[in-house]
Amino acid sequence: MKTTYVNATIVTMNEQNEVIENGYIIVENDQIIDVKSGEFANDFEVDEVIDMKGKWVLPGLVNTHTHVVMSLLRGIGDDMLLQPWLETRIWPLESQFTPELAVASTELGLLEMVKSGTTSFSDMFNPIGVDQDAIMETVSRSGMRAAVSRTLFSFGTKEDEKKAIEEAEKYVKRYYNESGMLTTMVAPHSPYTCSTELLEECARIAVENQTMVHIHLSETEREVRDIEAKYGKRPVEYAASCGLFKRPTVIAHGVVLNDNERAFLAEHDVRVAHNPNSNLKLGSGIANVKAMLEAGIKVGIATDSVASNNNLDMFEEMRIATLLQKGIHQDATALPVETALTLATKGAAEVIGMKQTGSLEIGKCADFITIDPSNKPHLQPADEVLSHLVYAASGKDISDVIINGKRVVWNGECKTLDEERIIFEASRYKRGLQR
């Protein structure tokens, strides 16, 4: 089926960051087959023409690091540093999860993401109390594009660790799909929660299955001190010594990196998921994204979980990301709007291995979102589109979300998830958690 979306202002995020006024996009099934300016002449003999009535159309946002299974934990453990937050609040609560609660929590996160303009994401979930197949089915039902990864820890006995490795390898073999809507990565939690043997096994699984790796790394000064004291190496060098960087790797955070480490990461195709709000809220610090980009590191913006953010609004992350770089460098030119948008769209897609999305160009997947500025005073005057998207817009402004050519959100209504039921069940399951 061919559908044309006409009368739109199109933010292409192509190589020229071209913005097309009064343009149209032609979609055939799941692919974009044309993007042009001017009046549509129906040269392609399309089946349906939809008038966007001047809406802004931009690529769907790509969240490079989150934990949607934790969505019921919003507001629990505020105003705490990372380690006590994990050890006294998050992990004890996650130990109470049941398969049904995990699905309800996941649905809430998916609903929030897709209604606020995120179309693709990379996720890590703690497998305790979780039916991994049910989580994957839930994500698939949402219509979103995702890399959903089972997190590995070295908690418990060596036998427990061995079993975790076996389960993770089965999971990777079952769900890894380089070009599909749903895939996975090998996901050791971090250097401070995984043994050397576990990290080495994760590296082996990634190499043998040709998958990517996703890990929390260099998130805090404490992590760097502890790893250096234990292994005689900083986290980057230690992770490399375990073989993790033999495959393209996404490190979440990268807050505490020096110049040599940034150069090393760029050389070894290690990408960074930048979580500005989460890093600020947990008191972890501010990642030097400007220096990362100058070193040649691929960077994508991310939200982390609602437990440490406390929302999944990628527009908010874009804005805080650019403002932080301007502030810490005392340089108003740091991370300009075009770069911020890139780090939330095509740049983010590249970070998590989804090059088929992230821009509105011929041959790309039909993943795009729309905003109607006509009834929004904070987006007026409406002629500075790129500026408004980064500095003024929010996820609440989203009208429509098309993923893989399908209308997942239309006129603000989610078509794939039951919003009323999800919100009701979220409250019901949250009450059952013992705090």
UniProtKB/Swiss-Prot annotation:
- Name the PANTHER family for this protein: AMIDOHYDROLASE-RELATED DOMAIN-CONTAINING PROTEIN, AMINOHYDROLASE SSNA-RELATED
Q: Write down the Pfam families for this protein, in alphabetical order.
A: Amidohydro_1
- Molecular function per GO: 5'-methylthioadenosine deaminase activity; metal ion binding; S-adenosylhomocysteine deaminase activity
- Output this protein's name: 5-methylthioadenosine/S-adenosylhomocysteine deaminase
Does the record carry Zinc as a key word?
yes
Q: Which reaction does it catalyse?
A: S-adenosyl-L-homocysteine + H2O + H(+) = S-inosyl-L-homocysteine + NH4(+); S-methyl-5'-thioadenosine + H2O + H(+) = S-methyl-5'-thioinosine + NH4(+)
Per the entry, the cofactor note is: Binds 1 zinc ion per subunit.
